[in-house]
């Protein structure tokens, strides 16, 4: 009897969940990892494991800052964020969410066993609750408040 390739099985289940939930991010991530795994690129796994999360945060930060860099958001709008109570509240919430995300990165790095649960929870939230797939770091941050940074 052939041995079960459990990492492949998990990736395929995540791909199916990504497709069913219309979560293109998870689907493309799984396809990328499958290509890396089954080609000579597989020697890049240690790099992806070590730097992938940091690289992803870098790309996300570039995306967030792009409207400022392109001039779509003017400097005056950034200043206005501190003058209106709704915008000031948005700044405070942004700070809190960034802090939670930082805790999430730490938790995911120190306790990788929680990553699968966070991913499954995110996919279920997208599929059943019409959520958006932006939550694993924040979810990990919230989890870290409950179980410790660890």
Curated annotation (Swiss-Prot):
Transmembrane stretches, start-end: 8-28, 51-71, 81-101, 114-134
Keyword tRNA processing in annotation: no
A single Gene Ontology CC term: plasma membrane
Major subcellular site: membrane
Keywords tagged on the record: Cell membrane, Membrane, Transmembrane, Transmembrane helix
Subcellular location: Cell membrane
Domain of life: Bacteria
Topology with respect to the bilayer: Multi-pass membrane protein
Family: Belongs to the UPF0756 family.
Protein name as it appears in the record: UPF0756 membrane protein Dd703_1075
Annotated source species: Musicola paradisiaca (strain Ech703)
Upper taxonomic lineage: Bacteria, Pseudomonadati, Pseudomonadota, Gammaproteobacteria, Enterobacterales
